Amino acid sequence: VGFKAGVKDYKLTYYTPDYETKDTDILAAFRVTPQPGVPPEEAGAAVAAESSTGTWTTVWTDGLTSLDRYKGRCYHIEPVAGEDNQYICYVAYPLDLFEEGSVTNMFTSIVGNVFGFKALRALRLEDLRIPPAYVKTFQGPPHGIQVERDKLNKYGRPLLGCTIKPKLGLSAKNYGRAVYECLRGGLDFTKDDENVNSQPFMRWRDRFLFCAEAIYKAQAETGEIKGHYLNATAGTCEEMIKRAVFARELGVPIVMHDYLTGGFTANTSLAHYCRDNGLLLHIHRAMHAVIDRQKNHGMHFRVLAKALRMSGGDHIHAGTVVGKLEGEREITLGFVDLLRDDFVEKDRSRGIYFTQDWVSLPGVLPVASGGIHVWHMPALTEIFGDDSVLQFGGGTLGHPWGNAPGAVANRVALEACVQARNEGRDLAREGNEIIR
């Protein structure tokens, strides 16, 4: 027929309701709010087009490739119950659109360009189905849940952590002292705050040295393995790796990274280094609410959590369900399972849009952190189960008798809750009795 220039509706090419999804497709569920007068089919097709092979007009070079093989397809649209003019649009992407082992490229393709789109009032990526064929191109977490338990020799209970406060302003020696007191009192881990990197009042090398000293002293006195999440996040990837190398030379068990501000490329590099050198990797999600807070625009945290499991991390902050940063319980448990389990069934009541098979990619320990304290312990033990890290910052350091007694209180409460649970008592009902 020859080439025919001109602008045509996206839905003629990219809306394909009879498409059968392939096992190798990456599937996305978008919450689409079209501008007034834009039909949902056109909006959904526009998203599929702009995040795959399409552009705003027909181009001559389309004839040089097979669009049928490479285009994203909007294959199903359903209205959102209780919302006016909101639709869930399902889009299937052929696997060949993505570079192997690159979360960076996956996000650049799927969410890189479409969110500023004129035809849409708002757009939110609710979930992704990562096919096993793509999962297998990722190393994933450096070690995973089982290997971590074996390294630490801690079984049958959640792990306990504490963020050292005040987060900024302590000297390295005083910081190390706080670390020692918490670990000595019974915590498994202490943590650098996400914004502790290398500032004038405390340079990273000094902090690493004093924290290592605190760890070894506490280990010698308690006979337990201890750790402190040494934040290796830095302004350049090279500097980040340099800090991780120094941590390894000190012989400490774990380092930490802010994966959203640091970026997925840096995070994946660090995860590879950690696996090669036997370091655990704790991940903080600083900046996540910029992306996931709005209900109708941005990206749901479950997508960021899946991406982290692919990029690599052994722990990730995942909300609390109780405390100051409360999350909706079922939804939170949905992405907690996506982090830990090997296979998760589709379950819309928990916000899970697709069945996800992780094909033995190691699991990530969810970290409950943010405004929780010792009276939340029964609820946390029940909600999160054994494979989790419970992190009390002010809930440890705010104890009227000081840091070490605060740590003791948390450890005693945790042991009491685990014992009561194992004896078959009802934590939800008798929680306060148990820890009193």
From Swiss-Prot:
It catalyses: 2 (2R)-3-phosphoglycerate + 2 H(+) = D-ribulose 1,5-bisphosphate + CO2 + H2O; D-ribulose 1,5-bisphosphate + O2 = 2-phosphoglycolate + (2R)-3-phosphoglycerate + 2 H(+). It is an enzyme of class 4 (lyase). GO terms for molecular function: magnesium ion binding; monooxygenase activity; ribulose-bisphosphate carboxylase activity. Its EC number is 4.1.1.39. Binds 1 Mg(2+) ion per subunit. Its cofactor is Mg(2+). PANTHER family: RIBULOSE BISPHOSPHATE CARBOXYLASE (PTHR42704), RIBULOSE BISPHOSPHATE CARBOXYLASE LARGE CHAIN (PTHR42704:SF15). The basic functional RuBisCO is composed of a large chain homodimer in a 'head-to-tail' conformation. In form I RuBisCO this homodimer is arranged in a barrel-like tetramer with the small subunits forming a tetrameric 'cap' on each end of the 'barrel'. Heterohexadecamer of 8 large chains and 8 small chains; disulfide-linked. The disulfide link is formed within the large subunit homodimers. This is Ribulose bisphosphate carboxylase large chain.
